[in-house]
Amino acid sequence: MKVYISQLTETENIIDLLEKYEIGLEIVLFASPYCLDRQDEFIENYKIELGDLYGKINLGIHGPYADLIPGARDELITKATNYRMQQAYDVAKKMDANFVVYHNGYYPKTYSYIEWMQRTPTYWNDFKEGKEDDDIKIHIENVHEEDYFLLNELMEEIHDEKTSVCLDVGHVNAYSKVDVMEWMKILKKYIKHMHIHNNFGDRDSHLGINKGELDIIEILNIVKDKDITVTLEITNVDELRESLDILYKNGFIKLREVVKNNV
């Protein structure tokens, strides 16, 4: 298991954490259409902000999601979705990122299960064309799904080792009718990335790992010896620091060599 943190604040607020721990960074900036359209400028800014860490830490990209619908009825919406998602993939290539996370985009109150599955597998299979030789993994994330059936069937239809599930445990707790342990049991062969944050089941709060009703340590113990990446998606920087300290004390992450040598 390799641990990343999500950049939900300015780089200067988390740079010391990246320097202290052996963790990677999942960049959220390119979820913004504005940044995607100016990606070369923002990539150069990132190189400056990360300094000596750039090229030394593992990177992932969180792709765009607002207004994007892979299973859209309207072909124009599908084209816009593909355009933005391809832009994020291009960023991942330019930054030598290991993966891109995309939202599944399913809204239970808007689309029927059958309707969504008629179009979405085709979308993802088409999206993968021409990318066979790339090392970038594609992780499809649950958000508003009420159960795991749709993602399970989607993975069965895609048949690609580089395309997998990003299980967001906070989203499961906030939106699903099914316990997160059941999600993990059913989707275990497809889960290659996870978003880790906590809440009390009433909203998608993105709290620290010890601030909600999920037992995050129990969840991580299930996957700690697997070939999987996990990203802490915690909004409050102090809660992120506390969460990383907990992971360190429980043996999930290590100090960087430069830190250990200076202790």
Where are these regions (language model features)?
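N-terminal pre-domain/capping segments
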Residues: M1-Q87, E257-V263
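Histidine-acidic metal/acid-base catalytic patches
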Residues: K2, D16-L17, Y148-M155, D160-S164, ...
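Hydrophobic faces of well-ordered beta-strands that scaffold small-molecule active sites
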Residues: V3-Q7, I23-I27, L59-H62, V100-Y102, ...
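Active-site beta-loop-alpha junctions enriched in small/polar residues
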Residues: S6-E10, V28-S32, P64-A66, G105-Y107, ...
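Acidic (Asp/Glu)-rich catalytic clusters
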Residues: I14-E22, D40-I61, A88-D96, K128-D133, ...
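A short acidic, helix-capping loop that chelates divalent metal ions and anchors anionic groups
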Residues: Y34-C35, D67-A72, Y107-Y113, A174-Y175, ...
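Charged helix-capping and loop-helix junction motifs
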Residues: Q39-Y46, I77-M85, I114-W124, N152, ...
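Active-site acidic/histidine proton-transfer and metal-coordination neighborhood
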Residues: P70-S164, V258
